[in-house]
Amino acid sequence: PRNLQGATAAIDSAGMCRFVAFAVLDQPETCQALNDLLNAFYGWTHTGDDVTALGKRVLKMEREFNAKAGFTKEQDRLPRFFSADKVRPHDITFQVTDAELDQVFNW
């Protein structure tokens, strides 16, 4: 999930609709085609690793902005229903602790 979020942040910050992320990230050749498109449009010479790094930088900047705006990690939590309401047909809940969530962005 965190790699998907980073890749989606990179795609979104490059001016592409974030919904293309799902199609692009499922196929290596499509991902390469998008990278080629962005390189051609912006005059970049980015590799796939550069795009990954861009996504990480964007997410880091977003989190820094939120911290400066006064948001704390206690406010960066999923709604209670994620861990309380069972999802059918498997009757399971989201079983990730707050401590694990706090580590998601520690690259």
Language model segments and positions:
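Extended C-terminal regions of large enzymes
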Residues: 1-107
